[in-house]
Amino acid sequence: MKLPLLLALLFGAVSALHLRSETSTFETPLGAKTLPEDEETPEQEMEETPCRELEEEEEWGSGSEDASKKDGAVESISVPDMVDKNLTCPEEEDTVKVVGIPGCQTCRYLLVRSLQTFSQAWFTCRRCYRGNLVSIHNFNINYRIQCSVSALNQGQVWIGGRITGSGRCRRFQWVDGSRWNFAYWAAHQPWSRGGHCVALCTRGGHWRRAHCLRRLPFICSY
C-alpha cells in the first residue's frame, strides 16, 4: 500500500511544478507589455495638474458654456488677425486723460469714448497709443478709473481682462501679460452668465463679464 501512495504523491508534486512553470511563462509577456503604475504617474500629473489647480480656484456657472459658444472665436484669435487694419485712431476730442493716480507717478491712462468691440479697443490701444487695454492691480487705481468714467452715458467700459482656455482650464488673464492679482467683481460675478471679456461698471466700479463683440468705451494704459 505504501508504494501506490508514494507514486500518487510523486505524481501530484510533478503536476504542480509543471503547472507553475506554465503559469510563469504565460504571465511574463503580459507583464512586459503593461507599464507599472508608478511609471505612468509623473507624466499624467504633468498633464493634469494645471486643470486640477484651476478646478480648485474657479467654478463656473451654467451660463459659461453658452458664452463660450457665442464669442469663443474672439478668444482664440490674436488681435491683429481680428480687426480692420484700416481702423482709424480716435479724434482727440473723443479721449480724456485720467490723471492723479495715487502712488503711481508714471502711470498714464486714457479714456477713449468711441464705442468699439473688445478686439478693436485692444488694437486701438496698441496701434494709436503704443499701449494696451488697462490692467488693474489695486483698489486705488480701480477707484480713480471709475471716477473718470462715471459721467459717461454708458453703463460699462472695457478693461484688459479676458477669459482664456476652455472647459475647466479656463482662467482670467490681462492682455498686457501682467499678473492677475486683483479683482473687483460685481455681485454674483464672475460665475453668472456672461461673455469672455471683462468690463468695468461706470457706477460703482465693479467688474462684469461681457460679450466681447459689444461696443463700449475703453481705457488704455500707455
UniProtKB/Swiss-Prot annotation:
UniProt-annotated stretches for the region Disordered: 25-75
Functional description taken from the UniProt entry: Cytotoxin and helminthotoxin. Also induces non-cytolytic histamine release from human basophils. Involved in antiparasitic defense mechanisms and immune hypersensitivity reactions. The proform acts as a proteinase inhibitor, reducing the activity of PAPPA.
Phylogenetic classification of the source organism: Eukaryota, Metazoa, Chordata, Craniata, Vertebrata
Keywords for this protein: Antibiotic, Antimicrobial, Cytoplasmic vesicle, Disulfide bond, Glycoprotein, Heparin-binding, Immunity, Lectin, Nitration, Proteoglycan, Secreted, Signal
Amino acid composition bias (Acidic residues), ranges on this chain: 37-60
Tissue specificity statement from the Swiss-Prot or TrEMBL entry: Detected in plasma and urine (at protein level). Detected in placenta (at protein level). High levels of the proform in placenta and pregnancy serum; in placenta, localized to X cells of septa and anchoring villi. Lower levels in a variety of other tissues including kidney, myometrium, endometrium, ovaries, breast, prostate, bone marrow and colon.
GO terms, molecular function: carbohydrate binding; extracellular matrix structural constituent conferring compression resistance; heparin binding
Annotated ranges, domain C-type lectin: 104-222
Pfam families to which the protein is assigned, alphabetical: Lectin_C
GO biological process entries: defense response to bacterium; defense response to nematode; immune response; negative regulation of interleukin-10 production; negative regulation of macrophage cytokine production; positive regulation of interleukin-4 production
Pro-sequence residue ranges: 17-105
An annotated GO cellular component: collagen-containing extracellular matrix
Reported modifications of this chain: Nitrated.
Miscellaneous comment: Binds heparin. Does not bind calcium.
Leader sequence segment: 1-16
Disulfide bridge partners, by residue number: 125-220, 197-212
Designated name of the protein: Bone marrow proteoglycan
Native species: Homo sapiens
Transmembrane segments: none
Domain of life: Eukaryota
Residues linked to a glycan: 23-25, 34, 62, 86
InterPro entries: C-type_lectin-like, C-type_lectin-like/link_sf, C-type_lectin/snaclec_domain, C-type_lectin_CS, CTDL_fold, EMBP_CTLD, Eosinophil_major_basic
